[in-house]
Amino acid sequence: MLHAGKYIVTDEKEENGLANTQQDRFKDILKEYWGYPDFRGIQREIIESISQGKDTLGLMPTGGGKSITFQVPAIAMEGVCIVVTPLIALMKDQVEHLRHKGVKAYAIYSSMQRAEILKILDNAVLGGVTLLYVSPERLSTEQFLIKLKHMKVSFITVDEAHCISQWGYDFRPSYLAISEIRKVKPEAPVLALTATATPATIDDIQDKLGFKQKNVFRMSFERKNLAYIVRETSDKKEQMVHILESVEGSAIVYVYSRQKTKEMAEYLQQAGISATFYHAGLEHSTRDERQTMWQEDKVKVMVATNAFGMGIDKPDVRVVIH
């Protein structure tokens, strides 16, 4: 490495050596914390991109290993990684898993006491937090923005990034507050992740998040572990009960209206199948409670509208009925 005045001149060989060392570090973290020998799909490319300070958009299917793409570099880099997600249940689940691995992860959500929130934010300012999970609504609070100014932020992760786009199927105005974080921390790159995006949504996500330049990584959405079956039947309810009784593990039944979720759950219960229902019209606490019941196998079937689905991580789901 040659110093020329204020400039540092690095030869290509040295740059390659540094890149290889960094790649080895990521791989070591993956092995140490998750036990996997190597990355899969586009995980490595996304991790390298965000670690180089580039705004990055990753399109990955459910089960594609999205969480690895921000958790590994967050552990490797200095500072706190801010993770924006709308799903409290997912926050709690990921924080619990990370803390079990010895990672300094915390979550801030609406039902927490103010003193507890302040303690976590102060800890983040002092460098005691590696990953900080927050809801998009939290971003625009004065309390959060004041503390954020004093944090060393490694990068910002935006999960379910399609929620920021008005072209997306699940637009959430609260996601627009992410642009305020970028004003406070312009040096922190953004990693946006989604499993659902049309070409228009892809462009809109990057524009709304203020990407310095377009930078998209795509993973194949082909799912070889899924089988798609269409059945014609004169009695859909009877056929559904037959399928649910025949298949072990958990199940999801999607219906087109909120009223139908309740009716179908009651029908299944009468047929001797444990079920609950979920839709956007329920209170947040009720939704969380029912999702937890299903996650913890207290009920077999979740009957829902398309409000249910983001961030679901349940390995024993064996059938999804529409």
Describe the function of each predicted region.
Residues 19-20, 24-33, 37, 41, ...:
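Helicase motor core with emphasis on the C-terminal RecA-like subdomain
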